[in-house]
Structures are given as structure tokens and as C-alpha cells.
């Protein structure tokens, strides 16, 4: 399993059969917003917890061109594929819209 360059990952302390979690931030945030509490919390409870930086956010920096929700959906689907097994997607604010669109493409 490779780690996408725009993801923060906290591995489960003990291996379980639980699906990995992929957190998607809202506008004006990045993967970092999940890392102080949420990722360690779920990793301690047996989940591999991932958070993706959508393009133009977080460690990725400012986007040079216009970025659409469809671009963000592509980022989430790419991260979900790189995880290696289907994750549970969790989004906050704008991230929830991205998650809804991503889920509609996965079905």
C-alpha cells in the first residue's frame, strides 16, 4: 500500500478488520485539521486513519488555476484507490459535498 503524497496517515496501533477511514476537510483547511485529535483517536481504536489534502489546500499550497468540486472528487478517489481497500469517507463542510459526489461515482 503506497501513501499518496497529499495524505496524512495514522496507522492503527493494533491490526483489526475495520475499514480504513478517509477524512476530507472543508474549505480553508487541509489534512492537518484532522491530525491533532481525529486521526490519533481513531488509530488508537483500531482504524487506519487517513486525511487527504485537496489540491490547492494544506501542504499542496495554493492552486495556480481554477479548481472545481470535480477536481476535489478526483483527489478523494485517487487517495481512496491508493489506500488499497475501500475506505469509509468522512467529510466536513465542503468536504461533505465532495464525499457525496465521490460516493455517487463509486456506486
Question: Where are the regions that the model predicts?
Answer:
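A short loop-to-beta-strand scaffold at the N-terminal edge of the catalytic core in hydrolase folds
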Residues: 2-12
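Short Gly/charged-rich anion-binding patches and loops
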Residues: 37, 75, 98
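Glycine-rich, phosphate-binding/catalytic loops in enzymes
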Residues: 38-41, 66-67, 106-107
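Active-site loop/oxyanion-hole signature of alpha/beta-hydrolase fold enzymes
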Residues: 48, 56-88
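Conserved hydrolase catalytic core segment
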Residues: 86-107
Amino acid at each position: 500500500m503506497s501513501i499518496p503524497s497529499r495524505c496524512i496517515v495514522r496507522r492503527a496501533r493494533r491490526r483489526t478488520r475495520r475499514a480504513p477511514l478517509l477524512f476530507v476537510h472543508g474549505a480553508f483547511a487541509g489534512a492537518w485539521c484532522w491530525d491533532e485529535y481525529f486521526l490519533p483517536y481513531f488509530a488508537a481504536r483500531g482504524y487506519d486513519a487517513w486525511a487527504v489534502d485537496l489540491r490547492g489546500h494544506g501542504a499542496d499550497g495554493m492552486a495556480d488555476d481554477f479548481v472545481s468540486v470535480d477536481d476535489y472528487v478526483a483527489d478523494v478517489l485517487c487517495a481512496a484507490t491508493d489506500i488499497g481497500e475501500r475506505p469509509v469517507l468522512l467529510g466536513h463542510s465542503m468536504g461533505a459535498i465532495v464525499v457525496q459526489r465521490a460516493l455517487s461515482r463509486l456506486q
